[in-house]
């Protein structure tokens, strides 16, 4: 029997189900603070990680990789009916609220424009699904979409296949396919007779492993300064704001590519021209705002008929979706 969560070594926290001001998409179920009572009911093992922050609110230690992974398992179990989900050690553990926002935004894009396959469930192509399979999980369970999920990493592919195989609600909607040539994005994946309503992608952000390490050091330094400012008495504080995860890990292919984000998306744009009649909308996340202007120029150069930028804000983090089509 599962009892309401009482975080260890503390009194009962302030209820976590009071919604806070949110910039998430209105259909995103991850509004406000996490409801730990419901999450623990969905996944009892989360209870051992439950603690309170200095404000007396239920949370976890976001610098503990196992706690973060367990929280994600609980979120997927509670909101998306995923009974089995796990990651190989060192692989990217995604922030689910932000990933869900991308899916809900592209759902609006499909609803507001001719999807190209009327009266049929949309078929979505996920470029670089990773071991987490996060976009196919959210999209298939939120909207009933079909997904083809791709990656170049064999460990990610095998993990994603295992997640699909064990969860019947995914097995009938999600196909996992390995990209054999790391230089290609769509080639070798989109067959001659395939049609996709939309593509999604969270591209590698950095240009080298050194860039990854430097960025992580800057992030850790900033977090330590913020914690010190919040705790002027020097009291130990291992808490991070819920949903600002500092322990996501990640393999090389998930974190960096030669030339960084701009180079990867530029390759995607150039390659998309050859599939202009087989994909209704191409989309990708763009983390660096300064990349938008040159990417827009490239899209105009290759003949994109429609170009859209959809801004997203998750706490202190701003990102945007770049979408284009040739129809």
Swiss-Prot record:
Region (Disordered): 1-31
UniProt entry tagged with the keyword Transferase: yes
SUPFAM superfamilies xref list: S-adenosyl-L-methionine-dependent methyltransferases
Molecular-function GO terms, alphabetical: 23S rRNA (adenine(1618)-N(6))-methyltransferase activity
Key words of the record: Cytoplasm, Methyltransferase, rRNA processing, S-adenosyl-L-methionine, Transferase
Source species, domain of life: Bacteria
Signal peptide: none
BP-aspect Gene Ontology terms: rRNA base methylation
UniProt GO cellular component terms: cytoplasm
Subcellular location: Cytoplasm
Keyword Transport appears in the UniProt entry: no
InterPro entries: METTL16/RlmF, rRNA_lsu_MeTfrase_F, SAM-dependent_MTases_sf
Catalytic activity: adenosine(1618) in 23S rRNA + S-adenosyl-L-methionine = N(6)-methyladenosine(1618) in 23S rRNA + S-adenosyl-L-homocysteine + H(+)
Location, primary (coarse class): cytoplasm
Broadest EC class assigned to this enzyme: transferase
Enzyme Commission number: 2.1.1.181
Function: Specifically methylates the adenine in position 1618 of 23S rRNA.
Family note: Belongs to the methyltransferase superfamily. METTL16/RlmF family.
PANTHER family: RNA N6-ADENOSINE-METHYLTRANSFERASE METTL16, SAM-DEPENDENT METHYLTRANSFERASE
Name of the molecule in the record: Ribosomal RNA large subunit methyltransferase F
Gene name as annotated: rlmF
């Amino acid at each position: 029997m599962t009892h309401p969560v009482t975080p260890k070594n503390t009194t009962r926290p302030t209820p976590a189900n009071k919604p806070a001001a949110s910039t998430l998409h209105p259909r995103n179920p991850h509004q406000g603070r996490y409801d730990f009572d419901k999450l623990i009911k969905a996944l009892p093992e989360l209870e051992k990680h439950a603690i309170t922050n200095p404000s007396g609110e239920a949370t976890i230690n976001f610098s503990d990789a196992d706690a973060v992974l367990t929280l994600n398992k609980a979120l997927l179990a509670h909101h998306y009916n995923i009974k089995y989900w796990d990651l190989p050690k060192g692989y990217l553990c995604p922030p689910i609220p932000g990933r869900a926002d991308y899916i809900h935004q592209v759902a609006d894009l499909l609803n507001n424009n001719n999807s190209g396959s009327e009266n049929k469930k949309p078929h979505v192509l996920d470029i670089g699904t990773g071991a987490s399979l996060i976009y196919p999980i959210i999209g298939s369970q939120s909207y009933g979409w079909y997904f083809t999920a791709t990656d170049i990493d064999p460990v990610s592919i095998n993990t994603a296949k295992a997640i699909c195989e064990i969860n019947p609600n995914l097995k009938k909607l999600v196909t996992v396919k390995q990209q054999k040539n790391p230089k290609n994005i769509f080639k070798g994946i989109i067959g001659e007779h395939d049609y996709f309503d939309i593509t999604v992608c969270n591209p590698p952000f950095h240009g080298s492993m050194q860039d990854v390490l430097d960025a992580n050091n800057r992030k850790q330094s900033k977090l330590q300064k913020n914690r010190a400012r919040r705790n002027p008495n020097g009291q130990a504080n291992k808490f991070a704001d819920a949903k600002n995860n500092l322990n996501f890990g990640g393999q090389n292919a998930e974190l960096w590519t030669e030339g960084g984000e701009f180079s990867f998306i530029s390759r995607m744009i150039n390659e998309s021209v050859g599939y202009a009649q087989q994909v209704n909308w191409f989309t990708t996340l763009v983390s660096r705002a300064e990349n938008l202007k040159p990417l827009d120029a490239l899209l105009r150069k290759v003949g994109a008929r429609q170009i859209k930028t959809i801004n997203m804000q998750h706490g202190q983090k701003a990102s945007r979706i770049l979408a284009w089509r040739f129809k």
